[in-house]
Amino acid sequence: MRLLGKRWIALTLAVLLTVGIFAYVMGGINAPSAANRYRTTLAHGGEVLWRGLSGIVQRSTNYTGYTPLADIPETENGYVPQGYCYCEAADAYIISYYHDKDASVLSMVDAKTGKRQKTVVLHQNDGTPFTGHAGGVADDDTYIYICDGNTIYRISLERLQTASDGAPVMLTESIVTDVKCSYIGTDGEYLYAGEFYTYYSDGRYDTDPTHHMQVSTTELSFARCNAYALSEFENAFAETPETTVTPTMSFTVPNRVQGFTRLSDGQFALSVSYGRNTDSWLYTYADVTKGEPAYYLTYPDRDVPVYSLCRTDIVSRLRLPPLLEGIDTKDGKVTGIFESGAEKYKNGKFILNSICEFE
């Protein structure tokens, strides 16, 4: 009887496993499509398992493939670096930070000397301190863009350059997007603004459910990155924007993306990280815009093509220290910052308080 019982248990488990695999595969045959509940639950379970194992299994800290260019300022003062860009017009690195108890700031670092030029304090339109996450910063040689939630702010580069060290800078112009912006980047033609996603039952990093897509037979995406033509939305910035700006195109992106930039050959670089004891990754994806869109989004004024950045589109990957954040390009190379040098992450497994160039 015991043997028979064990056989029934084994048979039941085998049937359930077979049905599960069949449902999982069949659910992805019609990709791209909205992610169904069954596959979403499996993906969320896998995400939680990944985070748990990544925190337990410690890989070597013998990292390669990066070269420090300059120190990241202000981390000794409680600021946490988030966004980063290289501004060619000023030949300076620009970094955005949040602070748990104070206003968010921007720092400029001279790219030639590596020395801090200034740090300015961000203020709201009404003059009160801006305490947003300031997750991304980008430039187009005329303006500096800063993102926080569904809003992208704009200040003139001239205003930043003429401001004195420690001075307040007002965020007087903004646009509203339909993505929860955690990072932004520019390539001279487009401004890219995208979402960070990892699953928690309390929904702390949730994104719009309409952004949850089955992008291939075996892959789901829960976040989106929009691309806005700089020439189209220049006049959309206002003190009190009333409508959501329509993107020119959009991309599905993987979980845990912290930075996004486009290379001169059209390829895309994404920084992926989460956790002070977990390796970061710098992924380079093929130029998916050379192919057909995966699907289209319908906006009131036009249909917008969406391209999927899938695992099969990765052309290179680089393992890096924990907490890689914003990235950009400089002289044809990807450069970026880490937040591990901030005081709140000093107990992480690898501290790197540097602006770095990557191979």
Locations of regions flagged by a protein language model:
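Sequence/structural signature of beta-propeller modules
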Residues: L3-I72, K346-E359
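A short helix->beta-strand "capping" segment at the edge of beta-propeller domains
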Residues: L49-G78, E242-P247, Y307-V315
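Beta-strand-rich domains and repeat architectures in extracellular enzymes and scaffolds
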Residues: T67-S104
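Blade-loop segments of beta-propeller domains
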Residues: T75, V80-Q82, V105-S107, G114-T142
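Repeated scaffold domains used in trafficking and secretory/extracellular systems
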Residues: G78-C85, T128-G136, I175-G188, P254-T261, ...
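Beta-propeller blade signature
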Residues: S104-G114, I155-M170, T207-E234, S280-P300, ...
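Loop/turn-rich, solvent-exposed surfaces of beta-rich toroidal or solenoidal domains
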Residues: S250-R311, R317
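Blade-level signature of beta-propeller repeat domains, shared across WD40, Kelch, NHL, RCC1
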Residues: E325-E359
